[in-house]
Amino acid sequence: MAEHNELGKAGENAAVAYLEEHGYLIRHRNWRKGHFELDIVAAKENELVIVEVKTRSNTLFAQPEEAVDLPKIKRTVRAADAYMKLFQIDVPVRFDIITVIGENGNFRIDHIKEAFYPPLF
């Protein structure tokens, strides 16, 4: 596995552990259907939480959350809509970003709640 893939997987594992420690129920990880993809689907207090995870070894060039641009937001919203239809979920949904910065399990985690709202298409 490529080094950046290993870092991404470790970051996602750290994000899941963080969410569980903070009372979130993890419904799915790396959910895919067709061309739709969601990193983490969680639930807490009757709310569905869609989490985009961005992992970087450092922030020399950019902050990880800057990688979540408008096209990525639109894809994530469409994927969340497909997920909710497939599983017949009718609760409020929130879109969060978790940034994971560091290496070798020594991570700094930042949870950005309500990081974005569904855009008007």
UniProtKB/Swiss-Prot annotation:
InterPro entries: Restrct_endonuc-II-like (IPR011335), tRNA_endonuc-like_dom_sf (IPR011856), UPF0102_YraN-like (IPR003509). Pfam families: UPF0102. CDD domains: PoNe_Nuclease. GO terms for molecular function: nucleic acid binding. HAMAP family: UPF0102. Belongs to the UPF0102 family. This is UPF0102 protein BT_2236. It comes from Bacteroides thetaiotaomicron (strain ATCC 29148 / DSM 2079 / JCM 5827 / CCUG 10774 / NCTC 10582 / VPI-5482 / E50).
